[in-house]
Design a protein with these regions (language model features):
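Residues embedded in well-ordered secondary-structure elements
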Residues: 52, 107-109, 211-216
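Short amphipathic alpha-helical surface micro-motifs
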Residues: 47, 98-103, 204, 220-222
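Extracytoplasmic/periplasmic sensory segments of membrane signal-transduction proteins
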Residues: 60-197, 253
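Juxtamembrane extracytoplasmic/periplasmic/luminal helical "stalk" adjacent to the first N-terminal
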Residues: 2-97, 114
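Extracytoplasmic/periplasmic ligand-binding sensor regions of membrane-associated signaling proteins
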Residues: 161-238, 248
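Short coil/turn motifs at secondary-structure junctions
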Residues: 125, 230, 242-244
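Solvent-exposed, extracytoplasmic
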Residues: 101-105, 236, 240-255
Length: 255
């Protein structure tokens, strides 16, 4: 799966660089400097590959640590409340307790600037009788609210999915497309990861194709892994790489 992710982004980078190269040729900018530019592009490609490999290593480590942290926090909450995982359904208070416990960890990941968002989803819902409840799942999704040409120096976090009281408690700005829960039909790879056999988690990472984030115009790729509790998959977690974030980390080569 790592190889698939690497190839996906590398192809995108090379496509952008090739387009720039063609435009400059047509414009006659470097009729006598083609060799020099070719060398520049080669160096740029090598640097991009190195940067991307470092990014993937960071994301894999973050995803694994997040999955393990969710397992610990959920187990602790359920043990303290003398509940089972099935008791999360139709229990807004218990769901809120778990989301409060996990909010700090998601904020830490987003602030690390190694991605444009972080999320977790558990196989439970606030109201099993609500319309669409069979495809609705609890969880948190935090996103960076300042990814663009000016970088992330003035980064702030937006609350995209989760219990609104958690956002208020943590003083996090609500995303203008906020929803309480995830529609798993809009979460690439969710069903695949829920069928994970419970062995080595890193072997099950799932890289989505580029998709439009639900309710927005933004293009993103999601890198997800399972959340395992007592040997059974109980949800998924992961990070978001938006197109804006990608363009910031891997800028086009300048002439």
């Amino acid at each position: 799966m790592e190889r698939r992710l690497f190839l996906y982004w590398l192809i995108m980078v090379l496509a952008v660089m090739t387009a720039v190269f063609v435009v400059l040729i047509v414009a006659g900018v470097f009729s006598n400097d083609a060799g020099k530019l070719g060398g520049t592009l080669s160096v740029q490609q090598k640097n991009t590959t190195m940067t991307f490999n470092k990014l993937i290593d960071t994301l894999n480590a973050q995803n694994l640590a997040l999955s393990e942290q969710i397992t610990r926090e959920v187990s602790d909450v359920l043990e303290t409340e003398e509940r089972t995982f099935k008791d999360l359904d139709n229990n807004p208070e218990l769901i809120t307790r778990i989301e409060e416990r996990m909010c700090f960890y998601l904020q830490t990941i987003v602030r690390s600037r190694s991605c444009s968002g972080a999320y977790f989803i558990l196989d439970a819902t606030t109201n099993t009788e609500a319309p669409g409840a069979d495809r609705s799942r609890m969880g948190l999704y935090l996103r960076s609210g300042n990814v663009g040409t000016d970088g992330m120096a003035n980064q702030y976090i937006t609350f995209f999915r989760g219990v609104a009281d958690v956002a208020r408690k943590e003083n996090i700005q609500m995303h203008n497309r906020w929803n309480l829960e995830f529609d798993i039909d809009n979460v690439p790879g969710y069903e695949i990861l829920m069928d994970f056999d419970g062995r080595r988690i890193l072997d099950s990472c799932y890289l989505s194709n580029r998709v439009t984030l639900s309710g927005t115009w933004e293009q993103v790729v999601l890198l997800s892994i399972p959340v395992v509790l007592e040997g059974k998959v109980r949800g998924v977690c992961g990070v978001e790489l938006s197109e804006l974030f990608f363009n910031m980390v891997f800028p086009s080569v300048e002439s």
